[in-house]
């Protein structure tokens, strides 16, 4: 019975809260809107004429980036938690048998670790996405017509970012 409880706690630990999903989606929407400004300012693609394309591709990229944020968040949180487990064990040996204090300290440490993992996930994925979009749009697909350049560059940038987030090397 204890094993079942342990596994269910692990399963629920990997669930993403609604707040996190909202934060991820808002951040991914903001980052996916950056190329809209670039294409409007640099390539003179009118926002009024291409509103449907901008909106649909940006929404697609935001959804894909949301999954990438979650993947990196999980890996970063596990790595940070594992590295900080040694710190909490060492501090328990020094403090003694103050179980309430240790439990509160562990809870605060888990919350801080979670926030740090969210921040690292957002920074990493934003950088990868913007670098991919820049390389695709300005170097690889520079001779493709602008509308197709935008669609391909943003979609591939988001897809590649999501693909790279599934790697176990983080």
UniProtKB/Swiss-Prot annotation:
It is found in: Endoplasmic reticulum membrane. Residues 46-51, 142-145 are cytoplasmic. It comes from the Eukaryota. The keyword Kinase does not apply. Residues 1-24, 73-121 are lumenal. It is a multi-pass membrane protein. Coiled coil: none annotated. Its main location: endoplasmic reticulum. InterPro entries: SSR3. The chain crosses the membrane at residues 25-45, 52-72, 122-141, 146-168. GO terms for cellular component: endoplasmic reticulum; endoplasmic reticulum membrane. Keywords: Endoplasmic reticulum, Membrane, Transmembrane, Transmembrane helix. GO terms for biological process: SRP-dependent cotranslational protein targeting to membrane. It holds the Pfam family TRAP-gamma. Belongs to the TRAP-gamma family. TRAP proteins are part of a complex whose function is to bind calcium to the ER membrane and thereby regulate the retention of ER resident proteins. Heterotrimer of TRAP-alpha, TRAP-beta and TRAP-gamma. This is Translocon-associated protein subunit gamma.
């Amino acid at each position: 019975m204890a094993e079942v409880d342990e596994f269910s706690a692990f399963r629920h630990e990997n669930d993403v809260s609604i707040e996190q999903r909202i934060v991820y989606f808002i951040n991914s929407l903001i980052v996916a809107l950056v190329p809209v400004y670039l294409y409007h300012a640099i390539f003179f693609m009118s926002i009024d004429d291409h509103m449907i394309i901008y909106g649909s591709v940006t929404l697609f990229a935001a959804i894909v980036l949301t999954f990438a944020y979650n993947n990196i968040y999980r890996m970063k949180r596990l790595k940070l938690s594992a590295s900080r487990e040694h710190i909490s064990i060492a501090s328990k040996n020094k403090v003694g048998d103050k179980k309430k204090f240790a439990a509160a300290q562990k809870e605060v440490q888990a919350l801080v670790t979670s926030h740090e993992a969210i921040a690292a996930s957002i920074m990493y994925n934003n950088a990868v996405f913007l670098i991919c979009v820049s390389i695709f749009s300005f170097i690889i697909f520079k001779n493709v017509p602008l509308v197709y350049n935008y669609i391909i560059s943003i979609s591939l940038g988001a897809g590649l970012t999501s693909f790279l987030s599934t790697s176990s090397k983080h």
